[in-house]
Amino acid sequence: MGCALALALAGCQGASDQTLAQPCIAAPVVPDPATPQAGMVRVAGGVFAMGAAAERPEEGPPRQVRVGDFWIDQTEVTNAAFARFVEATGYVTLAERPLSAEAYPDLSEGERAPASLVFAGAAHLSPDPSTWWRIVPGASWRAPEGPGSDLQGRESWPVVHIAWEDAMAYARWLGRDLPTEAEWEYAARGGLTGARYVWGDAAPDPETPQANTWQGVFPAADSGADGHKARAAPVGCYPANGYGLHDMAGNVWEWTKDWYRPGLAPAGVIEAGGPLRAMAHDPAEPGQPKHVIKGGSFLCADNYCFRYRPAARTPGPPDGGASHVGFRTVLRAPMKEIAGD
């Protein structure tokens, strides 16, 4: 549970009013193994400047990275798409499984019950980030806010409460993979060189929202100026980037395949692919290997998180799902194993 909370604090769903900022993709593609490229966009590979020097230490130094050709989901994986996977395979997500008594002997049966992290909100600026979240028994991708909630009307929303192994299981069912951090960032930049945001260098404009993020002082109040107040949006509600990809900024955090280390590798053109598990390191929790998550979420505000930029990166524990964490997949051309798998 501590790992899950660490993931939540990386970037801070409670029920709230919602209005649509603009038309969304009416019917996102629901893929299956018979249509391996359905709902994906082909991205031609190349060399790009990965990372940033001016924002946060873990994002630099900028380096030249080469990525090959690949296909990537046009949108985040939706509830409808994940439901098809579960129906076909009988898969049970980590949030739906109880903790084992052998691994957690000091916890009671109730404390080991299936649960996940849900954003609780805050009526004031609490100095304790742990108060912003609740471990909710029964919360999972099927019930995003816990018992009593469901997916009715949310078929096109991004699936959440997904741990890294859940995302990998879905990807492998389709013969796909999770993107490396370099592939994800290359795709998010959409062909722009060195831009601060996925849409360019211009600061976010509340009159023409480009992404689902938090408007206002987090966690006290979200004005909902972007059309969605303190919650995820259906996929494709905001303009696509230069490669035709939606929601590469905000909405929900997205898993990558890479293990996390603060900072990037030394300069020089290198091939995409992150460090091995043995090299993973999070200074905040040494000894607990984590994966890189990218893109920020609907909880990212300028006063807290501010990670809805393509260079931004933060660690996520593999067993940590929450109400603001989802994913998308890639299909490489040709497919190949990535170091560190």
Which residue stretches match the model-derived regions?
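N-terminal pre-domain segments of enzymes
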Residues: 17-34
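C-terminal motif of bacterial Sec signal peptides marking the signal peptidase cleavage site
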Residues: 10-11
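Short, structured beta-strand segments at or near domain termini in extracellular proteins/domains
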Residues: 323-337
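Functional-site microenvironments in short loops/helix caps that host divalent-cation chemistry
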Residues: 18-23, 42-43, 49, 54, ...
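Short, solvent-exposed alpha-helical surface patches in non-cytosolic proteins
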Residues: 74, 79-86, 163-169, 185
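Short proline/glycine-enriched turn/loop segments at secondary-structure junctions
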Residues: 281-285, 314-321
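Short capping motifs at secondary-structure boundaries
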Residues: 70, 85-94, 174
